[in-house]
């Protein structure tokens, strides 16, 4: 098989901390071009953000069309002196390849490329349909000039995707324990309570917003938003900070703010969720407390790839290699799958995610071989 470990090493050695590409997309483009893929390098820009390089590569012109998606950008390594091996060395020690991005998610991309090249080598260089790669350099930061725009660009060209595999590190403990088939949506906001500033010795001349915001935090936090659904855990609203902008101990503040985030399931849409929280806030305020919510824009909506032939195919490929039947899960944070879901069914399956974003991020060499075999099994079944 094509050596996914070598590709992983070459990618890790590109210090592609967002927004830098540092040659990572070039590594992939060279491999895919050599195998007969038509490749496109697209740079997206937006005022106030860094320009980001993206890569789209496709071989085949007919359906069915499966695309592998991913990101080559990584988070900063942190204190490099704390690493056992240099953060961008890609060195192997004791059965693990070390480096920022080994797990999240250069290893996953390397495995998908290796599997695709092996499949093509065994089928005279052409799939029984189409294989493509959607690779961005803007996932770990603002995600503005990355996958969301790359998908729009592809759609404008007439590209149609039937299914997608996103190689995020989905497994919790061992290879084959989990496929992500959906994600909860994310909505942030700021609760603002108005008072009247005054001297602490004359409280009758002031209105203290601190007790009021405390009551509202309890009111909005205590009652569940829902009790979950068939595929999703219950939604949760979490307050993350409270601030009055006041450093003086003898002044009653005039305003109090509390930031919060909601992770919501398919019991809600973004609009219905906001309406529910606003309704509860109005009830808690009554006629006395003056408060409102400033909602932040969000492109992170809930999505679900319903279990069916595509998930069955992936489960079969995983089980045939690992002997494990993976859980179909919707837990965890957001990913670029939230954008892809608007274009085609998407699943997330990659390496074990235990060390992602940590000092000494590393991937098991054996797991990289296993993932490559699983991706090859998915392709074999997809084009059977």
Swiss-Prot record:
CDD domains: M20_DapE_proteobac. GO terms for molecular function: acetylornithine deacetylase activity; cobalt ion binding; succinyl-diaminopimelate desuccinylase activity; zinc ion binding. It catalyses: N-succinyl-(2S,6S)-2,6-diaminopimelate + H2O = (2S,6S)-2,6-diaminopimelate + succinate. Zn(2+) 2 binds at residues 104, 140, 357. The active site is at residues 73, 139. One of its GO terms (biological process) is L-arginine biosynthetic process. Coiled coil: none annotated. Catalyzes the hydrolysis of N-succinyl-L,L-diaminopimelic acid (SDAP), forming succinate and LL-2,6-diaminopimelate (DAP), an intermediate involved in the bacterial biosynthesis of lysine and meso-diaminopimelic acid, an essential component of bacterial cell walls. This is Succinyl-diaminopimelate desuccinylase.
């Amino acid at each position: 098989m094509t050596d996914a470990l070598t590709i992983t090493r070459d990618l890790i050695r590109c210090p592609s901390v967002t927004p830098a590409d540092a040659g990572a997309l070039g590594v992939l483009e060279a491999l895919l071009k050599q195998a007969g893929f038509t490749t496109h390098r697209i740079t997206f820009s937006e005022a106030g953000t860094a320009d980001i390089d993206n890569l789209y590569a496709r071989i085949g012109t007919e359906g069915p069309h499966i695309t592998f998606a991913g990101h080559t950008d990584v988070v900063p390594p942190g204190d490099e002196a704390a690493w056992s091996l240099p953060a961008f060395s890609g060195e192997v020690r004791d059965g693990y390849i070390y480096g920022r991005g080994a797990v999240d998610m250069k290893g996953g991309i390397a495995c998908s490329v290796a599997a695709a090249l092996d499949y093509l080598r065994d089928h005279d260089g052409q799939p029984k349909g189409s294989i493509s790669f959607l690779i961005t350099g803007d996932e770990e930061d603002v995600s503005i000039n990355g996958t969301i725009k790359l998908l729009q660009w592809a759609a404008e060209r007439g590209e149609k995707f039937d299914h997608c595999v996103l190689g995020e590190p989905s497994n919790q403990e061992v290879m084959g324990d989990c496929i992500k088939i959906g994600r909860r949506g994310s909505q942030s906001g700021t609760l603002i309570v108005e008072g009247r500033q005054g001297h602490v010795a004359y409280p009758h001349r002031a209105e203290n917003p601190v007790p009021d915001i405390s009551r509202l935090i309890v009111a909005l936090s205590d009652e569940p938003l829902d009790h979950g659904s068939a595929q999703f855990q219950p939604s949760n609203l979490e307050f993350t900070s409270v601030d009055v902008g006041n450093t003086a101990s003898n002044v009653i503040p005039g305003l109090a703010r509390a930031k919060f985030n909601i992770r919501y399931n398919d019991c809600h849409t973004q609009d219905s969720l906001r309406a529910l929280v606003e309704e509860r806030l109005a009830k808690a305020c009554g006629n006395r407390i003056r408060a409102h919510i400033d909602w932040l824009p969000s492109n992170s909506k809930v999505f679900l790839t319903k279990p069916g032939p595509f998930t069955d195919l992936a489960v079969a490929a995983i089980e045939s290699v690992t002997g494990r039947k993976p859980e179909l899960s919707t837990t965890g944070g957001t990913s670029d799958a939230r954008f892809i879901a608007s274009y085609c069914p998407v699943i997330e399956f990659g390496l074990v995610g235990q060390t992602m974003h940590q000092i000494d991020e590393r991937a098991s060499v054996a797991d990289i071989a296993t993932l490559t075999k699983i991706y090859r099994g998915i392709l074999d079944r997809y084009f059977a």
